[in-house]
Design a protein with these regions (language model features):
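Short helices/loops that flank or line small-molecule/ion binding pockets
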Residues: 15, 69-70, 87-95, 168-182, ...
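Paired acidic/hydrophobic, glycine-rich loop segments that form the ligand-binding mouth/hinge
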Residues: 1-3, 180-185
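Glycine-centered hinge/linker elements that transmit conformational signals in sensory
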Residues: 89-92, 132-164, 204-208
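Hinge/lid segment of periplasmic solute-binding proteins
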Residues: 6-60, 85, 114-117, 200-206, ...
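C-terminal lobe and pocket-closing loops
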Residues: 187-199, 212-321
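Short, solvent-exposed loop/beta-turn-alpha elements that line the ligand-binding surface or hinge
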Residues: 22-36, 79, 103, 107-110, ...
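Short helix-initiation/N-cap motifs at beta->coil->alpha
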Residues: 7, 81-87, 161-175
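Conserved C-terminal helix/tail region of periplasmic/extracytoplasmic solute-binding proteins
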Residues: 71, 294-357
């Protein structure tokens, strides 16, 4: 058995490394595959239409903000904010409390750090890493506009030390009252509104900001898969059926607390009265964010692979990390955005050339 994400499963399955789960699913009606959130199920399905993974954790992204700070400054969060509106709000919220900055955005190097939120901005600004013919588009106008916007926003109204701030640093900044807004993973809500959080009850949740698209949240899930070479596939499925099943959600809620159950996996979780009682502030915004995510068509132009905040090829972990370092350097003011993207274009095209027909 293996624990994989929706990044690896599409190409692992294509390479023949994973066993399809469809036979096990059909023979286990109690598992209730139809209850798995559709975007998660889609992202764990191979190009052959077969299921290769079952989620045990899932997330999208949304905008978190301090309701009390907004009220004190007479600011209003739109129901579906645009990035232009968020930039204005970040400016107006900066300094709302001593030392408070308007927004926290990841700047830490890593294909799963700064590139996750940045790529959602690129998508909604009309950009893409590659066109459908594997021509890199990092120095094209939409990608440049999105990156310039992101870098300028975090430099102008973002957290101190932004070039080294990842999820954990932004979580700490938001909890400690150092920022008024934070765009990041829906999973953060469980900490922000959890018992003992200094901002519990003070946080509002809005959809991922947009520009040219209707939605822009990312999609990520950790999942169980079965290796094709396994000699114990039936036993592996029994574990998966338990660990990703409805019963596990119930057991976790009763023993650990409902706010700590695995998020983003099953539709039934979001209609469970016990869960909603503890997660009422963020349950519906989380479900809406996940349901709105479109991993096969996240932008406004065709692209060669699925994936919202990543390019779904093995090489992305390498060239993506190199690109992220250049973006982080731009946030730190060490190089210009145009210089960063010029170098990034070459890195991406070198990887894309392998896939050109």
């Amino acid at each position: 058995m293996a624990t994989l994400s929706n990044f690896e499963i599409p190409f692992y399955s294509k390479n023949g490394w994973l066993a399809p789960l469809d036979t096990y699913i059909s023979g286990d009606p109690g598992f209730d595959q139809a209850d798995i959130l559709k975007p998660m199920a889609t992202s764990l399905t191979g190009s052959d239409g077969k299921v290769y993974g079952e989620p045990f954790y899932g997330e999208s992204s949304f905008l978190m903000y301090r309701k009390d700070v907004f009220a004190a400054k007479h600011l209003t969060m739109p129901a579906n904010p645009t990035w232009a509106q968020v930039a204005t709000l970040a400016k107006e919220a900066s300094g709302a409390q001593p030392g408070m900055r308007g927004i926290c955005l990841r700047g830490q190097p890593g294909w799963g750090e700064v590139l996750a939120p940045l790529t959602t901005v690129v998508n909604t600004f009309g950009g893409t890493w590659f066109d459908k013919n594997w021509t890199a588009r990092l120095n094209a106008a939409p990608f440049t506009a999105a990156t310039s916007f992101y870098v300028n926003l975090v430099k102008s109204y973002g957290e101190p030390g932004a070039s080294q701030a990842g999820f954990t640093e932004c979580l700490n900044n938001f909890e400690q009252g150092k920022v008024a807004m934070w765009y990041d993973a829906t999973s953060a809500a469980g900490s922000l509104d959890g018992a003992g959080s200094p901002v519990a009850g003070k946080v509002g949740y809005a959809p991922a900001p947009v520009d040219l698209t209707k939605s822009s949240g990312w999609l990520y899930t950790w999942a169980w898969a079965i290796e094709k070479a396994s000699k114990h596939q039936s036993a592996a499925w029994k574990f998966i059926s338990w660990a990703s099943g409805k019963g596990y959600i119930q057991t976790a809620g009763q023993n650990l607390g409902w706010a700590r159950v695995p998020p983003g996996t099953r539709t039934s979780t979001y209609s469970n009265p016990s869960y909603l009682k503890q997660a009422s502030a963020f349950a519906q915004p989380t479900l809406t964010a996940i349901d709105s995510a479109n991993p096969t068509n996240p932008g406004i132009q065709p692209r060669p692979t699925p994936g919202i905040q990543f390019v779904d090829i093995p090489e992305f972990t390498d060239f993506g990390t190199s690109v992220s370092q250049l973006i982080s350097n731009a946030i730190a003011g060490q190089i210009s955005v145009s210089n960063a993207l010029s170098q990034s274009q070459s890195l991406a095209q070198s990887a894309g050339n392998k896939y050109k027909s």
